[in-house]
Swiss-Prot record:
Superkingdom in the source lineage: Bacteria
Family recorded in the similarity comment: Belongs to the ScpB family.
Subunit structure, interactors included: Homodimer. Homodimerization may be required to stabilize the binding of ScpA to the Smc head domains. Component of a cohesin-like complex composed of ScpA, ScpB and the Smc homodimer, in which ScpA and ScpB bind to the head domain of Smc. The presence of the three proteins is required for the association of the complex with DNA.
Function: Participates in chromosomal partition during cell division. May act via the formation of a condensin-like complex containing Smc and ScpA that pull DNA away from mid-cell into both cell halves.
Cellular component, GO, one term: cytoplasm
Location(s) in or outside the cell: Cytoplasm
Protein name (Swiss-Prot/TrEMBL): Segregation and condensation protein B
Species of the source: Acetivibrio thermocellus (strain ATCC 27405 / DSM 1237 / JCM 9322 / NBRC 103400 / NCIMB 10682 / NRRL B-4536 / VPI 7372)
Main subcellular location: cytoplasm
Key words of the record: Cell cycle, Cell division, Chromosome partition, Cytoplasm
InterPro entries assigned to the protein according to its UniProt record, in alphabetical order: ScpB_csome_segregation, WH-like_DNA-bd_sf, WH_DNA-bd_sf
Gene Ontology biological process terms from the UniProt entry: cell division; chromosome separation; DNA replication
């Protein structure tokens, strides 16, 4: 098949999808092997990124591709949409998300064992934001739910796959959680002292 036609097919499929399309899907629909799919799309990415007249690019996300607007045009593109109230993630939610990202799939009990505190609220928030999802149940008493990160997580944080996650040891996460817990305790103690003096 002609290369330009193949690029047009991939571009049309990614545009129509509006979401990530897996390499397997692109390969099975076009009848082109996965290696060639990757080569063609990586070539398209280079073309898009080197052409300032193009407002779009293709992002690789977790063994798939998505057609996206270029980040440098964000200030213009955001004006097309109604302003939305977007609340950031709390420290607790970020800790929980990091634990899930590095240990997926993982149960709530294990998350709470690592954090040392209840994580219901953080997990609910992450589910609402589609950064994590249920990934089945552990084959253990009570059949606890397992959690894992989603494609939205990779998209939001700019990672292609697990291989792009910064390298941390579980001990680093434990230390960060402990530091944050100590910091919260210090804030609470300071506030209590102020109230006692007043």
């Amino acid at each position: 098949m002609d290369l330009k036609k193949l690029e047009g097919i991939f571009e049309g499929m990614l545009f129509a999808s509006g979401d990530k399309v897996s390499i397997e899907k692109l390969s099975s629909i076009t009848g082109i092997d996965k290696k060639t799919v990757k080569l063609v799309i990586n070539n398209m990415i280079v073309k898009y990124n080197n052409d300032p007249s193009r407002g779009i690019t293709i992002r690789e996300i977790n063994n798939g591709y998505q057609l996206c607007s270029k980040p440098e045009y964000y200030d213009y593109i955001k004006q097309l949409f109604e302003p939305k109230q977007r609340s950031g993630l709390s420290q607790a939610a970020l800790e929980t998300l990091a634990i899930i990202a590095y240990n997926r799939p993982i149960t709530k009990a294990k998350i709470e064992q690592i954090r040392g505190v209840n994580s219901d609220s953080a997990i609910t928030k992450l589910l609402e934001k589609n950064l994590i999802r249920e990934a089945g149940r552990l084959d253990a008493p009570g059949k606890p739910v397992l959690y894992e990160t989603t494609d939205e997580f990779f998209r939001s944080f700019g990672f292609k796959s697990d291989a792009d996650l910064p390298i941390f040891e579980l001990n680093d996460i434990h230390e960060t959680v402990e530091i944050n817990q100590n910091s919260e305790q210090e804030k609470a103690d300071t506030e209590l002292e102020k109230q006692e003096k007043a």
